[in-house]
Amino acid sequence: MAREFSRTRRIAQQLQQELAQVLQRDIKDPRIGMVTVNDVDVSRDLNYAKVYVTFFEEDKAVVEEKLAALEAAAGYVRSLVAGRMKLRVMPEIRFIYDASLIEGMRMSNLVSQVITKDKAKAAEHGREDEELDDTEQDDK
């Protein structure tokens, strides 16, 4: 029976869960603050792991500072996670900022604004639209 997920994907999922717990509970660095682990991409040889994280900050300088703090703590985080996972070799962790969540929220807000503007215009011109609909039906 073929496996649904490859070994690297299963390890990446477990690594994501363990990293999220370690970053929330065990890391007490105030520079890092609230961090979300969005995804983990593990190399095929399991030597490297790219960890995609999001902070709830939009200021680029603050994001860079938090990312630098995570990179500085990467070795310590790696040792904590290695104690929780049963792997012969623990992947080297590299943190990468993932702006997709923030960008998605921004786009969602833009869509919501457009919808409310369209509804306002429709309500404003509602009578004209109703009259046009009646004349179109009479023509048929």
Curated annotation (Swiss-Prot):
PROSITE patterns: RBFA (PS01319). One of its GO terms (molecular function) is ribosomal small subunit binding. It is found in: Cytoplasm. Keywords: Cytoplasm, Ribosome biogenesis. Residues 121-140 are annotated as: Disordered. GO terms for biological process: maturation of SSU-rRNA. Belongs to the RbfA family. Monomer. Binds 30S ribosomal subunits, but not 50S ribosomal subunits or 70S ribosomes. This is Ribosome-binding factor A. The gene is rbfA.
